[in-house]
Regions:
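Intrinsic-disorder-associated, low-complexity terminal segments enriched in Asp/Asn/His/Tyr and depleted
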Residues: 11, 23-24, 33
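Acidic, low-complexity intrinsically disordered tails
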Residues: 7, 26-31
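Short polybasic linear motifs
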Residues: 6, 13, 17, 21-22
Length: 307
């Protein structure tokens, strides 16, 4: 079952009443005020992952980045956009697949927040039928889980590409490296690191993007970021991962492979083209870093999806 969260001018989406929630938010972009988009300007994104990987929280951050809402809700406060029924409030988890939307970089993103439990896998199947790409979340403390395999199976069955997101990197026992190794061991799709965290754990506020070769640092838990040069003590690791990224992007297209052999590297646009081909063939899973709860990395993930 797919359920749409609708917005009406002047009213927030269905949720707890102001008395039940710690804050009352304003819906900034009701559907009636949207521009008309062509099919090429619309992306349907399916958020998948085992229970507790942070799909609903990431969906909330994406809506915030697109200025659909002026303040993020939380699972604990029972006021997220997608978990808005009494039973979801009671159990503190998604029961239904819910469709949200946001506008970002002159594109419309339809975001389908799917339940992680295999008890509700029918709604995941429905979501993938209409989705363009899966955003596959992993809890940085747990890595690949039993629930991850179930979600991956549906992506394979319906031949959908997936982008990997290591979420909750601000958790006490977050372990990015172990998470990546667990994905490599279990996934039939090769993970390729696009970002890695600088300081995972409770102090997590920065990651290095080896596609753009920049470091991004965040503050205030509101998505605001600084773009910085990569520190000297991280440069060797960043360059090594950039080389792996280039090689994996090149190997999926003969023209890119020839260009790589000729020049020894690829431009950022060439890398994106190679990753797009690898995604379409369902042979690559680009890996991104986020903390949905702190809105770290959300905007960069959305930029990649659009570009």
């Amino acid at each position: 079952m797919l359920r749409s969260t609708t917005f009406r001018s002047g009213n927030p989406a269905p949720r707890s009443t102001p008395d039940e929630a710690p804050h009352h938010r304003k819906t900034l972009k009701p559907y009636g005020n949207m521009k008309n988009y062509s099919a090429k300007e619309i992306k349907n994104i399916v958020l998948i992952g085992a229970p507790g990987t942070g799909k609903t929280t990431l969906a909330e951050a994406m809506a915030f980045e697109g200025k659909v809402i002026d303040r993020r809700g939380s699972i604990e406060a029972n006021n997220t956009l997608s978990d808005n029924t009494d039973i979801e409030h009671e159990y503190k988890r998604s029961i239904y697949s819910t469709i949200l939307f946001t506008e970002f970089m002159d594109r419309k993103l339809n975001i389908i927040d799917c339940p992680g439990s295999d008890d509700f896998c029918g709604s995941l199947f429905s979501a993938f039928k209409v989705g363009d790409v899966g955003v596959f979340l992993f809890n940085a403390q747990n890595g690949w889980e039993v629930g991850s395999e179930i979600q991956a199976r549906y992506a394979r069955l319906l031949k959908k590409p997936v982008i990997g997101v290591v979420n909750q990197l601000d958790a006490e026992k977050a372990n990015f490296e172990a998470t990546i190794e667990s994905i490599r061991a279990a996934s039939r799709v090769k993970p390729v690191i696009v970002q890695y965290p600088v300081n995972q754990g409770p102090e997590f506020n920065a990651f290095i993007d080896v596609l753009l070769m920049k470091m991004y640092r965040f503050k205030d838990n509101d998505g605001h970021r600084e773009e910085l040069e990569i520190p000297a003590d991280e440069m060797d690791k960043a360059q090594e991962l950039n080389k792996e990224l280039v090689e994996m992007a090149a190997e999926h297209d003969e023209a890119l492979m020839e260009l790589y052999f000729d020049k020894g590297t690829l431009t950022q646009d060439d890398i994106r083209a190679g990753l797009k081909i690898g995604l379409a063939k369902r042979e690559l899973m680009p890996i991104f870093c986020t903390s949905g709860k702190r809105d770290i990395g959300t905007k960069r993930l959305m930029e990649f999806i659009i570009n």
